[in-house]
Amino acid sequence: MACARGTVAPPVRASIDVSLVVVVHGGGASNISANRKELVREGIARAATEGYKILKAGGSAVDAVEGAVTVLENDPEFNAGYGSVLNVNGDIEMDASIMDGKDLSAGAVSAVRCIANPVKLARLVMEKTPHCFLTGHGAEKFAEDMGIPQVPVEKLITERTKKHLEKEKLEKGAQNADCPKNSGTVGAVALDCRGNLAYATSTGGIVNKMVGRVGDSPCIGAGGYADNNLGAVSTTGHGESILKVNLARLALFHVEQGKTVEEAAQLALDYMKSKLKGLGGLILVNKTGDWVAKWTSASMPWAAVKNGKLQAGIDLCETRTRDLPC
């Protein structure tokens, strides 16, 4: 397959049978340093494999995206959960969301501090409350009520994120977040054997952000969207730009208009870039299992599993493929 700029998609399907599909991303960002690339590649492949295992075992699309994103939240190479970037005060504030395309159920949390896996809390918001979104202290109180253990913030902070904040302060000055060099987010989309779709997105946000800043990741329609009639999307990139164009739902609008997944992703990202100069990326799977990973940022770690075949990459036209054990 020829590789266009920032685009990865599988070969054309041979049939319209529902296939199990998981696609994950590790965030649209500036170029990843050579000494981290293999760790990032391994982490993203591990997450996709975990999501696919859940589907193979009969789990739902929601189970799969939660499982895949949890793997990435637990990996310090990614900006979510353990290893989240720090705000202007050197603290962690994390956001996450999840959505079930079967009935449009959704849950989200923002500005949570002492939770190792915000995606799990977002799912509990979806399933255990009448609400879609909890934030800050309210979200943390809900986590306590649900029996989710609190984790001291210092245990979620890494030496790399401390150095990242110091470097950002020196280079840009506090609060200057117009065009962050690292807009790392993690996300997953999945299609299960019952034809249900889901997405999940999780992030630590933008390094050196103002206290209380919330980006696109927990916002349904911006950070992600899932509808069984259309597809599932998880986005990454400059959060303020993604919010302004409602990037996830915009991509699915183009699917609704009859565009292929690749065309839909390209149109949505091009609009954000032309209108706002906003860079980013997205992963999308439609109701028949066609998927795409597309980005306008310098790189976007991604991995996908379909029909037992794992594909993964980071940079343009750099894809590794292997068969998973049966």
Curated annotation (Swiss-Prot):
Keywords: Autocatalytic cleavage, Cytoplasm, Hydrolase, Protease
CDD domains noted in UniProt: ASRGL1_like (cd04702)
Protein name: Isoaspartyl peptidase/L-asparaginase
Positions annotated to bind substrate: R213, V214, G215, D216, T236, G237, H238, G239
Domain of life the protein comes from: Eukaryota
Self-association state and partner proteins as the record states: Heterodimer of an alpha and beta chain produced by autocleavage. This heterodimer may then dimerize in turn, giving rise to a heterotetramer.
Tissue: High expression in the heart and brain while low to minimal expression in the other tissues. In ocular tissues, high levels is observed in the optic nerve and retina while relatively low levels of expression are detected in the iris-ciliary body, lens or retinal pigment epithelium.
Keyword field contains Hydrolase: yes
InterPro entries: ASRGL1_meta, Ntn_hydrolases_N, Peptidase_T2
Organism: Mus musculus (Mouse)
Task performed by this protein: Has both L-asparaginase and beta-aspartyl peptidase activity. May be involved in the production of L-aspartate, which can act as an excitatory neurotransmitter in some brain regions. Is highly active with L-Asp beta-methyl ester. Besides, has catalytic activity toward beta-aspartyl dipeptides and their methyl esters, including beta-L-Asp-L-Phe, beta-L-Asp-L-Phe methyl ester (aspartame), beta-L-Asp-L-Ala, beta-L-Asp-L-Leu and beta-L-Asp-L-Lys. Does not have aspartylglucosaminidase activity and is inactive toward GlcNAc-L-Asn. Likewise, has no activity toward glutamine.
SUPFAM superfamilies: N-terminal nucleophile aminohydrolases (Ntn hydrolases) (SSF56235)
Catalysed reaction, written as an equation: L-asparagine + H2O = L-aspartate + NH4(+); Cleavage of a beta-linked Asp residue from the N-terminus of a polypeptide
